[in-house]
Amino acid sequence: MEEEDEEILSSSDCDDSSDSYKDDSQDSEGENDNPECEDLAVVSLSSDADRKSKNVKDLLRGNLVVQRQPLLPRVLSVSDGAAVCRKPFKPPCSHGYDSTGQLSRRLSARKRFVPWGSSTPVVVALPTKLEASTNIERDEEEEVVCLPPDIEPLVLWQSEEDGMSNVTTIMVHSVLVKFLRPHQREGVQFMFDCVSGLHGSANINGCILADDMGLGKTLQSITLLYTLLCQGFDGTPMVKKAIIVTPTSLVSNWEAEIKKWVGDRIQLIALCESTRDDVLSGIDSFTRPRSALQVLIISYETFRMHSSKFCQSESCDLLICDEAHRLKNDQTLTNRALASLTCKRRVLLSGTPMQNDLEEFFAMVNFTNPGSLGDAAHFRHYYEAPIICGREPTATEEEKNLAADRSAELSSKVNQFILRRTNALLSNHLPPKIIEVVCCKMTTLQSTLYNHFISSKNLKRALADNAKQTKVLAYITALKKLCNHPKLIYDTIKSGNPGTVGFENCLEFFPAEMFSGRSGAWTGGDGAWVELSGKMHVLSRLLANLRRKTDDRIVLVSNYTQTLDLFAQLCRERRYPFLRLDGSTTISKRQKLVNRLNDPTKDEFAFLLSSKAGGCGLNLIGANRLVLFDPDWNPANDKQAAARVWRDGQKKRVYVYRFLSTGTIEEKVYQRQMSKEGLQKVIQHEQTDNSTRQGNLLSTEDLRDLFSFHGDVRSEIHEKMSCSRCQNDASGTENIEEGNENNVDDNACQIDQEDIGGFAKDAGCFNLLKNSERQVGTPLEEDLGSWGHHFTSKSVPDAILQASAGDEVTFVFTNQVDGKLVPIESNVSPKTVESEEHNRNQPVNKRAFNKPQQRPREPLQPLSLNETTKRVKLSTYKRLHGNSNIDDAQIKMSLQRPNLVSVNHDDDFV
């Protein structure tokens, strides 16, 4: 019956019927009397009647089959119709709604309803953000981007078969390729080969981009993401949905970066600082099968809480994990939640893939390509144990050779899907940089408290009884805080926290001048609190010289918010403008602080940064100096923080200072960092040969000797090196010990020798440098033996540090990194000069006061010259009273500070 229906409703039958109707209508006009035509008309009418009755019967029985044919099929056919249907609708007319402004004006023109008895209209929640559509002509103009003549297209894949009709090449869009540097083009190609399966290995579907900070990992990953969202081997996109997981502080930054590079070409949603309902709604919108959203940007914590929403197999085709060292522990809930994704294409971004040990490195590798290195037990037995054993300073030659063989084998495997380039590549695009490790001796108060702590019975009992690790870590934290400033210990004692064990009865060691005479509260001795810490004293002079002599801005980094509080107090007392970013800073406010520091029109000077909260991903190029005030056990944290200023966009010379307290636990922590940095060679295959083999700087036995103090050395790190270069220049050391710092021996550098970055010439000490004070070539950061070794600050290639070191600096390591970009020289800030001139022209009692409450000082009493009068350093007195131009004779005749501690100095004394 269906065949009969099809025959009845065929196009030929319809044509016949139409012709018959036409003939019938012509016959009705009475012009044609031909009998054959009459017979034909009768037959056609009868056939139409039969067909109609038959169709009615089939319609009643439900067996009618209807066939429809398109009108003008050739005219209305669309090439690539499926791809066109996936695009969002755009009005064909050139004068359509091409901006939100027109639509907003039309909506706002409507009269609002005002209820009876009310003077204001009803507030209706309307969407505040409307998607602006663009016309077709404008979209076509944006798609056509011509490459400069000196830039070649980046073809990621090209078909080797001539018979492939769909796609012959996969290439990076010209809007992105014109911004890629050579190493970034290589990185995009490497990631594409891994995630697309072109690598050749069955168990490799992911990769780790382990470039150093500042090499553009974000841009490389965005380029890969956009290419896979648009192209594929069969003509359809290889990736339909992608998830970018990142720390909370970088969610908005990723959204801004994608908008910056590809604009609105990618439909994305970023879940940042949203309510729970908004997060759930956003995730549902993304995971909906027919959703237009292509990319989801989400934090690690948010993904962990809502991981069950992504259980569908089609919810993610590409996973990008930024700051992927967060996945170093495979037992965490975050790691397990991400590992449960069915997505095999995984791209991990981390500038520090090797952080503490090889076990953490295995966790990252196994997450990227599960099973590529076997299970955890096999890795631990076959790779980790021999490599760690061979790196010990006491290892035998056989153990060292076995470690080298296993390291080379591991390197060859992981380098199939790990790409790492050092920041030496940045030298072609950035100004020169110098890294300075500054060893500062502790003050008398710090040394007294330190010795009291390490000799306390509680500490000895805890170490003898093999106390819990948490208790030992508390002792280590207490010593590190003491190295920063005794004020942190004072606050701990007053608060009664557990960290006070070992500091019993220590309040009597603090000077009485630090407390109020009435209430006994801490007052800081009218600014003299700075001099209770060796590192803080050097920092205060460094800030003063920077503010007075240059227009440079500085970033102050610490692991403790209490230390940031001291930085803030110092800036307030000296009236330095500063910004602060720590864990309490909201996500929306962080980028505003960064923008304010990077704005050259703003009068900002110091940026206080918590290494835990803001050490990753921030671009602080508005500052060109950075101080790491205390070391972290994890070298990745310090490296991340130190890389904030030497990044794309930096125009000035960069100075990175690392402060260490001489002979204390801080030097041991830094040695441990260097040992961990040596593990990076496992993933750098070109450095696994015997000639570049390097072991641990700190043995396991040395690590047990954390609670010791060597206050009589210039640098404990340098003492353990047995540096041959410094032994050859021993005569220079003897001259320094005798106080003759200006003697220059026969080992002084020649004028024609290289000064990397021009730092020594800029500081005026190039012709005075000895061989040991110059670095050997371009050493790595962990190769301290090849750095410049300075027993005196006079030879340090940094004029500001020379003027700020004082007696507290005992030793300095320097490493100069070259840069091809000609730096902009620092100048004296005009605002600073005007402020100083204004202060000089004001009476003493009307000048800017150091105290934040800005109250006048008490009247100064005449000087008493009896035996109990304590000598005061003139420079300290001038600093305390905010006037560097007070006449010395005037001070001697009329001023007295009876409660200040006596300080020896080369100046005249009161």
UniProtKB/Swiss-Prot annotation:
Induction: Induced by gamma-irradiation and by heavy ion irradiation. Induced by the genotoxic formaldehyde (FA). Accumulates in aerial part of low-energy-ion irradiated dormant plant seeds, thus revealing an abscopal mutagenic effect. Residues 198-371 form the Helicase ATP-binding domain. Residues 1-39, 828-861 are annotated as: Disordered. Residues 396-417 form a coiled coil. GO terms for cellular component: nucleus. One of its GO terms (molecular function) is ATP binding. GO terms for biological process: biological process involved in interaction with host; cell division; cellular response to gamma radiation; cellular response to metal ion; double-strand break repair via homologous recombination; double-strand break repair via synthesis-dependent strand annealing; response to gamma radiation. Its main location: nucleus. Signal peptide: none annotated. Belongs to the SNF2/RAD54 helicase family. Interacts with RAD51. Binds to the geminivirus mungbean yellow mosaic virus (MYMV) and to the tomato leaf curl virus (ToLCV) replication-associated proteins. This is Protein CHROMATIN REMODELING 25. The gene is CHR25.
